[in-house]
């Protein structure tokens, strides 16, 4: 019984020590290998579109940042720190929708938010294929 309690406490401490508070990210690069990132210049209906697809977004380890002139909002945290906002604004340039893979590479740049297209792109990625296969086991 003591061993079981010890294993549970060590596991809990390990998880707490290794997990970073979502609000503490200061740069997009800190999310590498943890999340796929979607940077979006805000349009009136985009937040509702993203909210409606929250299950699919979560399943794909996708974090989105909706950028408007006055703020950046996200599904990751209630507030986005200023250094992270600056990093995000620098990454959105000629295309208002940017998908960044878990490896930190840009996977897609689009004019409009199309979740079916984004999900299809993500689902074709080798890392995503491995994630889906591991769920089946």
Q: Model segments located where?
A:
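Non-catalytic interaction/Regulatory regions outside core domains
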Residues: 2-137
């Amino acid at each position: 019984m003591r061993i079981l309690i010890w294993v549970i406490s060590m596991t809990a401490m390990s998880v707490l020590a290794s997990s970073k508070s979502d609000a503490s990210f200061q740069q997009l690069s800190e999310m590498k290998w943890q999340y796929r990132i979607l940077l979006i210049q805000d349009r009136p209906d985009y937040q509702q579109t993203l909210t409606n697809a929250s299950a699919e977004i979560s399943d794909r380890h996708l974090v989105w940042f909706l950028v408007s002139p006055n703020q950046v909002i996200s599904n990751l945290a209630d507030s986005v720190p200023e250094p992270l906002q600056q990093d995000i604004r620098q990454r959105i340039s000629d295309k208002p929708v940017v998908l960044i893979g878990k490896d930190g590479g840009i996977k897609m740049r689009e004019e409009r938010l199309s979740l079916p297209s984004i999900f299809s792109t993500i689902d074709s990625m080798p890392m995503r294929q491995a994630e889906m296969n591991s769920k089946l086991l």
